[in-house]
From Swiss-Prot:
Pfam families assigned: Com_YlbF (PF06133)
Segments traversing the membrane: none
Gene3D superfamilies, sorted: YheA/YmcA-like
Organism of derivation: Halothermothrix orenii (strain H 168 / OCM 544 / DSM 9562)
Family the UniProt entry places it in: Belongs to the UPF0342 family.
Name listed for the protein in its UniProt record: UPF0342 protein Hore_03100
Amino acid sequence: MALYDLAHQLAREIKNSDEYTRYKELKDKIMSNEATKSMLLDFQKQQINIQSKQINGQTITDEEKEKFENIKELINLNSDIKEYLDAEYRMGVLFNDIQKILFGGLEIGITENEKSTR
């Protein structure tokens, strides 16, 4: 079987998995409620803003920290968003595990050990 065929088969298996099915159900539920959708999108926007500032070494103001903490508290009280974020996290773990399996035995790039031997 060709590698691309295997990749397509893996994609189908993921799409039919319990994890993905649950994630999709929760996402659809969030997207069908404008208030919940807006709250999630605001949370994600603030999260990206703070992470971006951290990565770039910029200062996060007290106001930004407080605003983010407030929305995090609201998110934790909203079971739909909390379940969705948990499912999204589990999908991320699944993809990371699959990536480790796929690339774990491959020698791609130059290792630190190979760099030091001349």
